[in-house]
From Swiss-Prot:
It catalyses: S-ubiquitinyl-[E2 ubiquitin-conjugating enzyme]-L-cysteine + [acceptor protein]-L-lysine = [E2 ubiquitin-conjugating enzyme]-L-cysteine + N(6)-ubiquitinyl-[acceptor protein]-L-lysine. Residues 551-566 have a biased composition (Basic and acidic residues). Keywords: Cytoplasm, Metal-binding, Repeat, Transferase, Ubl conjugation pathway, Zinc, Zinc-finger. Pathway: Protein modification; protein ubiquitination. E3 ubiquitin-protein ligase component of the ribosome quality control complex (RQC), a ribosome-associated complex that mediates ubiquitination and extraction of incompletely synthesized nascent chains for proteasomal degradation. Within the RQC complex, LTN1 is recruited to stalled 60S ribosomal subunits by NEMF and mediates ubiquitination of stalled nascent chains. Ubiquitination leads to VCP/p97 recruitment for extraction and degradation of the incomplete translation product. The lineage of its organism: Eukaryota, Metazoa, Chordata, Craniata, Vertebrata. This is E3 ubiquitin-protein ligase listerin. PANTHER family: E3 UBIQUITIN-PROTEIN LIGASE LISTERIN, ZINC FINGER PROTEIN 294. The gene is LTN1. GO terms for cellular component: cytosol; RQC complex. Residues 1-20, 529-567 are annotated as: Disordered. Belongs to the LTN1 family.
Length: 1766
């Protein structure tokens, strides 16, 4: 069994090997053999009783219990702990009979494991024992004696949880009445166990020295000692008295042991503490035994008096007191003078060594028991004693702890009183009394006054209490002259106290804290009852948030009552205080006051003035003021008032003092702290005879130019005390103060609103605080000042806020607004019924308006201030709603605010941010109303109604929305219109302010959604109307082709604020809403119909209510515009049967239409519109009817050709006629698309001729394209031409077999020609006149349709164009004039700011590009090969456009690093610029590819010189996405199936605007792909010249996404190539990316292997040698080098490179020698042969090579023979 000594790993739940062995034995034999345990102090044999045979007993124990008992004997703590927990669980869960089987084994296990070193094990043991007791109950009785000793020890465990668990088990086993009996039953066994532990056991006997460390053994031993001592104490305290005597003998033997008494000096504090606790118990329960052992007890206890351990002290002093109380002669057993008292003095001098709170309360009982003999001489004894205490008080530990110092001072005073009361002879008594006052009490008082940490202690209260007791004794006459003794004592005290106080006061630099301490002391001496003693801790209360608010608001009132009681008690005490106290105290105060006023008058001492204020606060008597006046007059202080005024007040010294001194001090400007002067003022007022006198004084003060802080403090102090309030209430309510406060409010408001504030902020703050206080502070539901003045002040504040709203330059309004806010908030929240005043409601409205407007509109920039404003108005609204609920009144605020909001949202003056702020404010207001008025909801309902527009206002708001929205649905055919007012221009929507309809619908929708969220039924009808209007607004935005950013912001705001249809549907049933929208659609049509379609699409179903009108075909007659639009929008959602019925009805109606009804809504126009809408979706089995409709149209034409707008001027044409023609034109493409029956010749003639005639009308009326219906007419005419072109373009046999014989040829020769002869000049004309047509504008839709039609133009038609000639001066060209004109006309349109124009021009030019190189080819023949570095420009018209685009693009993209994807917003100016640039390059590359190899060299040379290609490549790596996955697929690593922009072809459709966001990235990838394919050498050159970062970006991107595509295309082009070489075969291996070329001529055989790199075409193509026969090594190397050079440096495919190389080799075999410079026969760039021969050596060279040789070497010698070259 290896690994025994290893630690058990976490998760190893298998039992130990011995456990498994036991388990195995149990399974095999059914029993566990008995193992005899090792013996301890007990004589039993482990858990196996020795009485019976082991096997016999073991069979009674359950197998699981056996296993657990085994584990409990293990050494490992975790094993024991888990086993014990398992044992407890088993005891709880198993049956009682099974558990009883364990009892014989339990005592031995319990006795051992309950003393375990690990505390968790001990705790678990007691918990398991409890479970065992609960299960076996009385069956435990036989085993009690063996358990009880250890059980009692466990109850005294030093680990509290274990002790608690043991006590819990004990209480479960025995009721409290039976516990003494149970202990008495086992007392002998308990004593045996305890004595063994106390006298016999050692650390080594309790634990195995071989396995347990010494430290652990000792810790366990000391713990068991402690527990045993405590257990013995517990036994003594719980045993019945009658059982005590039987224990005395055994306890006597314990007490006789010296070892026991040594525990009092034990090194472990816990043992000493337990020993002294036991000693106390002995004294308490066995006093006779203790007296017998007095010689041991007294020294053990009394001589330990200086033990300073915190654990020991409480028990020690308890034992000391018990010992001296129990043993009468205890002092005879110790030497008190040498042994006990010196130790006591040491403890006292050291301040109790941090244990004063424990030791000092025991000092008085202790010294009271010291016999007289020991205390002689008493004078020295008491001097030493009290001096020691005072010295201890100066100890730093005592000073730092208030509780320590309090305990010392309290003990000092108690012992002082004790010493004073000692009965001794008179002389000694007098000496002791003098010593105690002069040398002890007064010095202590002096020390406390000078030490701030002691000033708040209990000394002053203790002195007051002591004086009271002495005064009581002094007043009662007695025979033994006690009263005289105490009178003398008091006299001495007051004399010495006066001298001490004068010492502190009579100096210029008097310490302020000391002075305050003196005043506090005098206050306490005068009124000890009023002040709360510092050692009485404040009662702490938990306050819950749901307490009634009124309680919180009346907190100030409660304070007031408390203070008022205090003040009244002061007066009572003053009247009834003893004459023995009053006179000396008043003398003392007068002396100190007189001294202070001298320093104040002569030295301007501030601290003396504050001291004087404190004195007067509690001693405001006329005598004191008289003293002050006398001293003041002596000092010659100038009077503050005229003599006349003085005469009036001459009688009252306090008033004289006010006018002579106090006012002077109050007026001093330098003074910041005024509160103590205000206290003096209250002292003066207190001495006044009447309220009138006080009012006159305060009114005088109000008239004076005093600082506002004085009045603030006067009012604040009055609010905190009803006594003070009663002194000034007349003045507060008076006119003088009221008028002054109104003026103050006016000044403050105006000051804040001036451009430059002049007042310092601090004084301003004080003034605002005064206002706030007088408005918000109410006493007994009355305002401090008169109601009239409150209202006037509120008016001023409201007026100021209104100005703050209107000021344009209001940088300094914020402090003012902030202060007004504080005042208002305090007023609203604390004053009940404050909103009864109209001015209060106006103020509330103004604050709300400030919050509900954008910060830049209100010029408030601090967010904190806005939050403060919000908090203010919300508290105001809460107060208002509570008031409305109780009074049932109407609210001006709610009415006015609703009207203001209504005006704001309907005025069209808000932007998105302003609207958002307004909605947030209104939401907060509504939430507050909902919360406060949840039951009825009437306030909220009324508020929503006030804000909501009426029917007329809604119509006005809808009409104010611009009609720009109509363009898109009209153009797409979703709606059809023939109205007169559409004959004019359409006003565009604004881009700075939101239309009123949008603001109104958003705000009100938010309001009703809030109402619905709060489960209020009221408002449901409003909700449907409002959400319908909101949907109308959203539909208006959706229909705009290019909505301004403002509207996109608005939509984002709605999402953010959860104002959505989805939110409404989640809160309410939408059936009624759908019905409302349907009704409006039927009535009004237009945008309501589109809104209805959107709702239906969202619901994915048509409700029955919506289709009930269409059950019969007559349900929608007569057709109105509303019904027409409703039908058009409903048609996609109708089932086939309903749709078929609708179409039948329309066709029937068309057949019966008269000439007058053709263009009316209820006639042909309406029916055709419905028919077109129905067909737009899909065919549904009515195909056979379609040709019939065509016949009807032809019949109309025959009968009334004037109704058909053929080749005519549309200026005077009615809107009805235009609408009718538009619907007819729309019908024809649908007929071609869905009709299955072949059309007759005359029908085709009608369609073709009508189409051309309508196009002529379109061409002739281009000046009227700004008129919506004319524009739509032009668009649908062009769309018809596009549809016909598309129909005839493929000319598949299936299409042509059903057509008339000559129709296709007629189309090609006449009609198609006619279309493009009309449209191409029109296209040029329209683009020329609308240079800045933005994408999505009205005119642009015509260009889109025109461009779409022109994409079908053929190459020949382009070449035979009839455009006016257009040439550019200085333009180099080889093109014929006709072709050059076409290029010069169309190329600049690639710069046009409309995508449709750019794409259509690209499609037209791409048909021309392959035709252009041949004109340069002819010109190339005239070039000689003498010239070097020839360059030829691609078409000049394209290049000039490219140059312009490069300049513009550089400005946009230069700031973006190469490799970082630049997102281009669709249809922005940047989009059109980038699109034009990429299309231009696509055309250039198409042109390049169509050129011959020789031309390519020249073109590439041009691109290299202009660096255009380099710029392109840099731009492409800004325009291509990092992960070019197609159709939103995301895949980091491309695999064969991943579609990327490189694998998927780009289809540029003129009208296709589906995925515009991916169009630029896809086009950029397409251009890069073509560039790599057709110009690989140039790209490679650029790549090698790039900086390292760009180099890596390009390499990584190309390798990852492009190389694989290009490699496979190159390999497949080799495989599918039809090019044949004479004597050379080419094969390709796609898997290995290899091409193998085999060349054979006569006996020569060459095999070349061309390997494509992984980053093809950036990396070099490697050419490896295969087999070769008949070729010299040098020649072979030359040829391999040539092929590698061709493939690397020529811009073409592998096949082209191989062709060039083969020609070179062929020429070599024909006898033409290599050029000795490039070692090739054919030149790599211009493909020329070596022609220039040296006259000396006759060798021939290429002209280009020779030119390069001459320029690089700066010599004109032959490269070979070095002779001069001629």
């Amino acid at each position: 069994m290896g690994g025994k000594n290893k630690q058990r790993t976490k998760g190893n739940v298998r039992p130990s090997s011995s456990g498994r062995a036991a388990e195995l034995l149990a399974k095999e034999r059914g029993t566990v053999p008995g193992f005899i345990g090792f013996g301890t102090s007990q004589s039993d044999l482990g858990y196996v009783p020795a009485v019976q045979g082991a096997e016999e007993i073991d069979s009674l124990v359950d197998a699981d219990f056996r296993m657990v008992l085994r584990k409990l004997s293990k050494r490992d703590i975790i094993t024991k702990l888990k086993a014990m927990q398992e044992f407890g669980t088993m005891c709880k869960e198993r049956e009682a009979e099974v558990v009883k089987g364990v009892l014989p084994y339990w005592p031995r296990i319990y006795c051992k494991i309950s003393l375990d070193h690990d505390r968790r094990v001990r705790e678990a043991t007691q918990q398991s024992f409890e479970q065992l007791i609960l299960k076996v109950k009385k069956h435990l009785a036989p085993y009690l004696k063996s358990i009880m000793g250890y059980w009692l020890i466990a109850q005294c465990d030093t680990y509290s949880p274990a002790a608690s668990a043991a006590k819990e088990a004990f209480e479960k086993a025995f009721p409290s009445s039976k516990q003494p009996e149970a202990l008495a039953f086992c007392k002998d066994e308990i004593l045996n166990v305890l004595q063994d532990h106390l006298l016999k056991e050692t650390p080594d006997t309790l634990s195995d020295p071989q396995t347990v460390p010494e430290e652990e053994r000792e810790a366990k031993f000391f713990r068991i000692l402690t527990c045993s001592l405590l257990a013995l104490k517990k036994l003594l305290s719980m045993l019945p008295k009658k059982e005590m005597h039987s224990l005395e003998e055994k306890l006597m033997s314990l007490l006789s042991q010296n070892k026991f008494w040594k525990y009092g000096k034990h090194s472990t504090p816990q043992v000493r503490s337990a020993f002294f606790e036991l000693a106390s118990a002995f004294c308490q329960f066995l006093p006779e035994l203790v007296k017998a052992e007095a010689p041991r007890v007294c020294p053990a206890v009394l001589l330990s008096i200086d033990d300073s351990d915190a654990v020991v002290c409480p028990a020690l002093w308890e034992a000391v007191l018990h010992a001296i109380a129990t043993i009468e002669d205890c002092w005879s057993h110790v030497n008190a003078r040498k042994g006990v008292l010196p130790k006591l003095w040491t403890v006292l001098r050291e301040g109790g060594r941090g244990l004063a709170t424990v030791i000092y309360p025991n000092i008085l009982p202790f010294i009271s028991k010291v016999p007289p003999g020991i205390t002689e001489p008493k004078l020295e004894y008491f001097r030493t004693f009290f001096s020691s205490i005072i010295q201890g008080l100066s100890n730093e530990r005592a000073l730092a702890s208030p509780s320590e110092s309090s305990a010392i001072i309290t003990t000092f005073m108690e012992c002082l009183r004790f010493a004073i009361l000692q009965k001794i002879d008179e002389d000694e008594q007098r000496q002791i009394h003098q010593m105690l006052i002069y040398d002890q009490l007064i010095p202590l008082t002096d020390a406390v006054l000078q030490e701030p940490r002691l000033q708040n202690g209990p000394l002053f209260y203790q002195i007051a209490e002591t004086l009271s007791s002495w005064e009581a004794k002094a007043e009662v006459s007695s025979d033994d002259n006690t009263n005289e003794v105490f009178q003398k004592l008091l006299s001495n005290f007051w004399d010495r106290l006066l001298k001490m106080c004068i010492l502190h006061v009579d100096k210029l630099e008097a310490d302020e804290k000391t002075l305050f301490a003196i005043s506090d002391m005098l206050e306490v001496l005068q009124n000890p009852k009023t002040a709360t003693k510092p050692n009485n801790r404040k009662s702490l209360k938990v306050k819950f948030s749901d307490e009634d608010e009124s309680e919180r608001n009346t907190e100030n009132g409660k304070i007031t009552e408390v203070r008022s009681n205090s003040d009244s008690e002061i007066q009572a005490d003053l009247q009834h205080s003893s004459i023995l106290r009053k006179e000396p105290l008043e003398n003392l105060v007068c002396n100190l006051a007189e001294l202070s006023i001298v320093y104040v008058n002569e030295q301007k001492s501030e601290q003396h003035l504050k001291f004087l204020s404190a004195l007067l606060n509690f001693f405001s008597s006329n005598r004191v003021f008289q003293v002050l006046l006398e001293q003041g007059s002596n000092a010659g202080c100038p009077p503050a008032e005229s003599q006349e005024d003085m005469k009036v007040h001459n009688e009252n010294p306090s008033v004289q003092f006010l006018y002579m001194n106090l006012i002077t001090w109050l007026k001093e400007d330098w003074r910041k702290d005024m509160h103590f002067l205000v206290d003096i003022l209250y002292s003066v007022l207190n001495c006044c005879n009447s309220d009138d006198e006080r009012k006159v004084i305060l009114d005088d003060l109000t008239k004076m130019d005093l600082k506002w802080i004085v009045f603030l403090q006067i009012i604040q102090k009055a609010c905190s005390s009803t006594t003070k309030l009663s002194l000034i209430s007349e003045w507060l309510k008076g006119d003088m103060l009221g008028e002054r406060l109104v003026m103050l409010a006016d000044d403050l408001c105006h000051l804040g609103l001036k451009p430059i504030a002049t007042s310092p902020e601090s004084s301003s703050s004080e003034k605002w605080t005064v206002l706030s206080l007088v408005l918000s502070q109410h006493i007994k539901n009355e305002s401090l000042i008169g109601e009239t003045y409150v209202e006037r002040i509120i008016d001023k504040l409201q007026a100021a806020l209104s100005k703050a709203k209107d000021l344009s330059e209001a940088g300094n309004t914020e402090p003012s607004v902030s202060f007004i806010c504080d005042v208002a908030s305090s007023f609203f929240s604390s004053v009940k019924g404050c909103l009864l005043m109209p001015s209060s409601e106006d103020l509330l409205l103004t604050i709300f308006q400030l919050c509900a407007q954008r910060q830049d509109a209100t010029h408030l920039t601090v967010d904190l201030l806005v939050c403060k404003l919000k908090h203010t108005w919300i508290s105001g609204v809460n107060s208002l709603v509570r008031h409305l609920r109780s009074m049932q009144n109407q609210s001006t605020f709610l009415h006015k605010s609703a009207l203001w909001i209504k005006n704001q949202i309907q005025s069209s003056s808000l932007d998105v941010k302003s609207l958002q702020v307004l909605i947030s404010a209104v939401s907060d207001l509504l939430s507050t109303l909902l919360e406060a008025d949840r039951q009825s909801g009437c306030l909220v309902g009324a508020y929503v109604e006030h804000v909501m527009p009426n029917r007329t206002e809604w119509e006005t708001l809808r009409e104010s929305l611009s009609a720009e929205w109509m363009h898109k649905p009209l153009l797409e055919g979703r709606l059809s219109m023939n109205c007169e007012h559409l004959g004019s221009c359409v006003k565009l929507c604004g881009t700075t302010k939101l239309p009123g309809h949008l603001c109104t619908s958003a705000l009100l929708s938010k309001m009703v959604l809030l109402v619905l969220e709060n489960d209020m039924v009221k408002g449901n009808e409003d909700a449907e109307i409002l959400v319908a209007e909101l949907l109308y607004s959203l539909q208006w935005i959706e229909e705009l082709e290019n909505p301004p950013y403002l509207l996109l912001e608005y939509l984002h705001m709605l999402e953010e604020m959860h104002i959505t249809y989805e939110k409404f549907s989640a809160l309410s049933n939408t059936t009624n809403l759908q019905q409302t929208i349907f009704d409006r659609s039927e009535e009004h049509g237009r945008l309501w119909s589109l809104t209805m379609a959107k709702v239906i699409r969202g619901e994915n179903a048509v409700s029955r209510e919506m289709t009930k009108l269409f059950k019969t075909s007559e349900g929608f007659l007569p057709l109105t515009e509303g019904r027409l639009h409703t039908l058009q929008c409903l048609s996609p959602f109708l089932i086939e049967e309903e749709k078929r019925e609708l179409v039948f009805h329309c066709v029937a109606k068309l057949m019966t239409c008269t000439q007058t009804e053709l263009s009316s809504t209820d006639g042909a126009f309406g029916c055709l519109a419905i028919l077109n809408s129905s067909l737009n979706d899909k065919s549904f089995g009515c195909d056979h009817l379609l040709p019939g409709v065509l016949k009807i149209i032809i019949s109309w034409k025959n009968d009334n050709e004037d109704s058909f707008l053929f080749s005519c001027n549309l200026k005077e044409t009615s809107a009805q006629l235009l609408g009718f023609n538009i619907e007819m034109i729309r019908y024809l493409p649908l007929l071609l698309k869905y009709s299955t029956a072949p059309l007759a010749d005359n029908e085709w003639d009608f369609i073709m001729c009508s189409m051309l005639a309508w196009l002529e009308t379109t061409s002739e009326n281009y000046s009227l394209y700004h008129v919506p219906l004319v524009q739509i007419f032009a668009c649908v005419s062009c769309d018809l031409a596009s549809a016909l072109s598309a129909y005839f373009e493929p000319a598949a046999p299936k299409t042509t077999e059903n057509l008339p014989v000559n129709l296709v040829s007629e189309w090609k020769e006449f009609f198609s020609e006619g279309i493009h002869n009309l449209l191409l000049p029109l296209f040029v004309k329209v683009t020329g006149e609308t240079k800045t047509a933005a994408e999505g504008s009205f005119q642009n839709s015509v260009l889109t349709s025109l461009g779409e039609a022109l994409t079908y133009i053929s190459k020949d038609q382009l070449l035979n164009h009839k455009l006016p000639a257009k040439f550019v001066a200085g333009q180099k060209t080889n093109l014929p004039d006709n072709l050059q004109t076409l290029l010069n006309t169309l190329s600049p349109l690639l710069l046009f700011w409309a995508r449709s124009v750019q794409v259509s021009v690209y499609h037209m030019l791409s048909k021309l590009m392959p035709e252009l190189p041949k004109f340069d080819d002819e010109d190339l023949k005239s070039y000689g090969d003498e010239e070097e570095e020839l360059a030829l420009s691609p078409p000049a018209a394209l290049m000039s456009v490219l140059a312009t685009q490069e300049l513009l693009l550089e400005n946009i993209l230069e700031c973006i690093p190469v490799g970082e994807f630049a997102v281009i917003q669709p249809l922005s100016d940047e989009f059109c610029l980038v699109l034009g640039y990429l299309l231009t390059w696509k055309l250039t590359l198409t042109f390049f590819k169509a050129a011959s190899s020789q031309l390519r060299v020249l073109y590439s040379q041009y691109l290299r010189r202009t660096k255009s290609l380099n710029k392109l490549l840099y731009h492409l790596f800004r325009l291509m996405p990092e992960n070019p996955v197609f159709s939103g697929l995301t895949s980091e690593v491309p695999n064969k199936d991943t579609k990327t922009f490189f694998t998927e072809e780009l289809h540029l459709d003129v009208k296709g605007t589906g995925a515009l966001s991916s169009q630029i990235p896809h086009l950029a990838c397409s251009v890069y792909h073509i560039t790599l394919k057709d110009l690989p050498a140039m790209v490679r050159l650029w790549w090698n010249s790039c900086e390292k970062r760009v180099f890596n970006v390009v390499d990584k991107f190309t390798s990852k996404y492009v190389s694989s595509v290009l490699s496979s295309q190159e390999i497949s082009s080799v495989q599918t190539s039809t090019q044949l070489f004479n004597g050379m075969t080419v094969k390709a291996r796609s898997a290995a990316r290899e091409v193998i070329a085999t060349y054979s001529v006569d006996d020569i055989f060459i095999e070349l292997i061309i390997q494509l790199p992984s980053n093809y075409p950036l990396g070099s193509i490697t050419v490896e040698s295969g087999k070769r026969v008949g070729v010299a090594v040098q020649q072979w190397r030359n040829w391999m080098l040539q092929l590698s050079t061709y493939l690397t440096h020529q811009n073409g495919s592998i096949m082209e490179g191989l062709s060039l190389w083969k020609n070179n080799v062929d020429k070599r075999f024909e006898g033409i020698e290599d050029c000795m410079i490039c070692f090739s026969v054919i030149h790599g760039s211009n493909y020329s042969l070596p022609k220039k021969a040296c006259r000396t050596c006759k060798k021939k060279f290429h002209s280009a090579c020779l030119y390069k040789w001459f320029t690089s070497s700066n010599k004109s010698t032959c490269p070979l023979c070095r002779e001069t070259f001629f």
